[in-house]
């Protein structure tokens, strides 16, 4: 897939990040992952991001990564495009990007590097090195320690035609407006705050109607219903789902740092699609929290 095709995929629809399946020992569970993708693929997501943040990219080894991406590509071939997460130190990010391209992924989401703070020049060098290492499309992700400014993005886009997408995980509306005004239709834009449904209507008003849904992993019908409500400006449906599910879910998710991933694995377990435990340093939900989440899910009805 050429970069412009990736940009087109990101232009509309709901995106999601499948969980990565682990067994009781915390090792990659290939068969479980295949079954998960087979279950999610028909629900209508425009693309699935393998080994993204919700897929615990930050806990995967370099040896595991190529096999996980290959499994996703092979399982979803001809059904739904696969975009791979890639990130970490520049050389490791390049290894991941090249492995994803070799596996047949449609592009990468370049996740923030780990811990190290850097200025715009260093961030740009990191992004450009990854872009230059592959031919397929790259989506850059503003989050945490990696926050590219409009001028930096413009310079990168001019030098790297395969940089075609921008995902925002910061939530700085002023910065998002500045980036959109600077870059226009040069990029496809993706809302990427945790539990993105809460912010979906606001991002749509900014010119970013596409977002990634973590809850698609366990309530795919509700996730699609909410996306359709946002697309149709159906405020009553949005407000009903926000009040009855997403805001109570948010309260539960915010109890412990790292629960943004843990609660998704908990939800998958509750609906009968157990993905196994999270890897440390994340922790699984407590039994009482599982019961609270189950009550929220049950109230939504069949998926």
UniProtKB/Swiss-Prot annotation:
Pfam families: DHDPS (PF00701). Its EC number is 4.2.1.41. InterPro entries: Aldolase_TIM, DapA-like, Dehydro-deoxyglucarate_dehyd. It catalyses: 5-dehydro-4-deoxy-D-glucarate + H(+) = 2,5-dioxopentanoate + CO2 + H2O. GO terms for molecular function: 4-hydroxy-tetrahydrodipicolinate synthase activity; 5-dehydro-4-deoxyglucarate dehydratase activity. Pathway: Carbohydrate acid metabolism; D-glucarate degradation; 2,5-dioxopentanoate from D-glucarate: step 2/2. Gene3D superfamilies: Aldolase class I (3.20.20.70). GO terms for biological process: D-glucarate catabolic process. Keywords: Lyase. Belongs to the DapA family. This is Probable 5-dehydro-4-deoxyglucarate dehydratase.
